[in-house]
Design a protein with these regions (language model features):
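Short, low-complexity N-terminal intrinsically disordered segments enriched in polar/charged residues
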Residues: 1-39, 43, 144-148
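A beta-strand edge to alpha-helix "cap/lid" segment located at domain peripheries
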Residues: 2-13, 70, 74-148
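Short charge-dense sequence patches
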Residues: 16-29, 63-69, 124, 128-129
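Generic alpha-helix detector with strongest preference for long hydrophobic helices that associate
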Residues: 6, 18-22, 50-54, 99, ...
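A solvent-exposed, acidic/Ser-Thr-rich amphipathic alpha-helical stretch
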Residues: 15, 34-38, 42-96
């Protein structure tokens, strides 16, 4: 097995657990499918994002397990700002960890900029997910655009 990270271009479907999560996660998010998103996570998954305190009125940005993650995905589906787009060019993986960027510059304008970093378990479910925000995305939070 090659432990070196691999860069992959997006294809029409996913044949490995990494590809399945990469395509299914983006698809569920773009359709505001909170249940579809949650189904990609292990029951005891850990999710971290600056959006957690913003939408759930919590001090911590860390959620543990489906019971804590579900309310975030429900609110995210209902409140996602229109500036949220889904342009990306591929991902990096070592077979267990999955990393991709939603870059600010899409070539057709700006979108909210994130890096999604996930670790999958042996069942191919997301065990740990950290979302890192770029400056354009942080400005969306500062302007309170998720509370529409």
């Amino acid at each position: 097995m090659n432990d070196r990270p691999t860069s992959m271009r997006a294809s029409a479907s996913g044949s490995t657990p990494i590809e399945r999560v990469y395509f299914a996660w983006d698809d569920a998010l773009s359709r505001n499918d909170a249940g579809g998103l949650l189904a990609l996570y292990a029951e005891d998954a850990v999710f971290e994002s600056p959006l957690v305190p913003q939408l759930l009125d919590r001090e911590s940005g860390v959620l543990r397990g489906h019971d804590e993650i579900r309310p975030l995905f429900d609110k995210l589906a209902a409140r996602k700002p229109p500036v949220r787009q889904y342009y990306r060019t591929g991902y990096f993986t070592d077979g267990k960890r999955l990393l991709w960027e939603y870059p600010r510059d899409t070539g057709r304008g700006d979108q909210m900029d994130f890096v999604e970093a996930m670790e999958l378990n042996e069942q191919g479910l997301i065990q740990r997910h950290c979302v890192y925000w770029g400056w354009f995305g942080v400005r969306v939070l500062q302007r309170d655009e998720y509370h529409r």
